[in-house]
A protein has these predicted regions:
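Catalytic-core "active-site belt" of small-molecule-metabolizing enzymes
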Residues: 1-105, 109, 113, 122-150
Length: 150
């Protein structure tokens, strides 16, 4: 979710949702070996989460393409094999409620990105893996292809 206007302490989920300007799919990558090593040492994990290329974002899709926030499906294929399948109907908290709750804790500013979670299917990627992310919109599908760089 791309935030297009400041959102602070909003208690009305419908109003919170109005701060969203566009949606996309993203991959929030983790260097698991480094993360495990940092955990064993009792150190923070940010080096395993914040590295060059650690957050792949597809192109933004305008909200006019999303008619029903409760019926958005998305998939990730790795080398043409289905790896992850998600659906906004399966989120613990709907998107509007999630945004309102976040805005109670800290201010969301224009340009901020909110990622809503990861469906089952997390697994290691290898150099040159071909990734296909698909956002199944109500009027059309949006497909992005990329690959894992060494």
């Amino acid at each position: 979710l791309r935030i297009d206007r400041t959102l602070k302490a909003e208690t009305d989920p419908a109003k919170a949702l109005q701060a969203v300007g566009a949606v996309t799919l993203g991959l929030d990558l983790t260097l698991r070996d480094l993360q495990d090593d940092l955990k064993k040492k009792g150190q923070p994990w940010e080096r395993a989460k914040a590295f060059d290329g650690s957050c792949i974002l597809a192109d933004w899709v305008e909200l006019s393409e999303i008619k029903d926030w409760k019926d958005v499906h998305y998939t990730l294929h790795v080398n043409d094999e289905l790896r992850q399948k998600g659906d906004t109907a399966l989120l613990i908290f709907d998107i509007a409620t999630l945004l309102a709750d976040i805005s109670q804790v800290f201010t969301l500013e224009e340009g901020d990105v909110v990622m809503t979670g990861t469906p089952a299917g997390v697994a290691a990627l290898k150099a040159d893996d071909q990734l296909t992310m698909t956002l199944h919109g109500q009027s059309q599908d949006f497909v992005w292809k990329t690959f894992v760089q060494a």
